[in-house]
Curated annotation (Swiss-Prot):
Cellular compartments annotated: Plastid, Chloroplast
HAMAP family registered for this protein in UniProt: MatK
Coarse class of the protein's main subcellular location: plastid
Upper taxonomic lineage: Eukaryota, Viridiplantae, Streptophyta, Embryophyta, Tracheophyta
Protein known as: Maturase K
GO CC terms, sorted: chloroplast
Any GO BP: mRNA processing
Protein family according to the UniProt entry: Belongs to the intron maturase 2 family. MatK subfamily.
One Pfam family in the UniProt entry: MatK_N
Species of origin: Coronilla varia
Keyword line: Chloroplast, mRNA processing, Plastid, RNA-binding, tRNA processing
Amino acid sequence: MEEYQLYLELDRSRQQDFLYPLVFHEYVYGLAYSHDLNRSIFVENIGYDNKYSLLIVKRLITRMYRQNHLIISANDSNKNRFLRYNKNFDSQIISGGFAIVVEILFSLQLSSSLEEAEIIKSYKNLRSIHSIFPFFEDKVTYLNYISDIQVPYPIHLEILVQILRYWVKDAPFFHLLRLFLYDYCNWNSIIIPKKSIYTFSKNNTRFFFFLYNFYVCEYESIFFFLRTQSSHLRLKSFRFFFERIFFYAKKGHLVEVFVKDFFSTLTFFKDPFIHYVRYQGKSILASKNLPILMNKWKYYFIHLWQCYFDVWSQPGTIHINQLSEYSFHFLGYFLKGGLKHSVVRGQMLQKGFLIKIIIKKLDIIVPIIPIIRLLAKAKFCNVLGNPLSKPSWADLSDFDIIARFLRICRNLSHYYNGSSKKKSLYRIKYILRLSCIKTLACKHKSTVRAFLKRLGSEELLEEFFTEEEEILSLIFPRTPSTLRRLHRNRIWYLDIFFSNDNDLINHD
């Protein structure tokens, strides 16, 4: 944020009126592609492969200035094209500029809203994706039904631009944005093919992610608005971070549309006990009441996507299941619901009796098969989980080889330490440990047995199992009973903000 504010010396009260000129400033593209504006390498033409030079950006901005974008005609579309020379390359540069401009605006609004609400510290903890699992563990005893929802995508980009205009007031900026998308994505057709969306998202990753996140934020804001209206209790776990133009008027109109089919029924089934969790393109809706209320929310989502976003969604894509009999994959874990039966023996005077207690539980398990496939793809083992050596690392020093394996092992252990069953995690560590030994033996042109015999012991590789224990001992008292309890219990880390399979096995 400090870097953005350094380049954008705008009055906060009028920032929304000055987005259009920012698109024609060179430093915006420098921020978009992480270039230092004071370095000479940004001024030089550094070759065809690394094309993001200041000279090319200047030429593109000059061409955008000279073209007349006020009129779009179907007859002379080739004469007045927004992207003429290298369509994919020009779109990457321009979309990066668009993305950084809107990100700056929304970041400033979000930070100011958080400062006013004084929830910055708790917000940072809630950003961690691992905060979802303790939430599930705390609430699972009260929940009966769960709905697994896949957020439909893609939608027509024109709809996104129209919705975005309710947040930002700068009309020229949106005219330029619409013209760019019109030229690049072929808006002459009513339906944009998935191939075009894939090409656009691949070449313009940053801008595509912003549009997708904005789309999800928009439909969730409507969902939480109606959720608040249909509840006796005030909703405390959600806050609108951004000031919205015509917000309540638009939501009020949406309520009137569904008043016959949806809202009047919800008025009868008043229940505040609904929990909603989302990460990436997957959402989970859970409730304690009968499935009839869940069915109402299910059809609400379908009508919302179809009527408000023009996205077709089949009712069969949203499933309602009983939590005690349901299992699903979420954020790299395998979550399995069930019932835990306990028998307590009691005695009153001379009479003894047994009390049978049934408690709902949620097992959070490490999915061993997908992780083995991931390790096999990276050549640490085969598809059966048998460790392999890494000949490509044989040129490194012994210290670097061990450090790389330790870093990968630490990443996996850090992420999956919240598992209720640690046996699968220990197996993953075992695979990496033997792969490290085989790599060292391959480097020294020896067998594994001879290499270990020459070392005399395996103390060199004990760090695979002792490093995590040393870290935990800095936080908790180092007693045998405490360490045994830590190995058995789940530990969630609140410093994990995203999940990516490639990052888990990344040695950098």
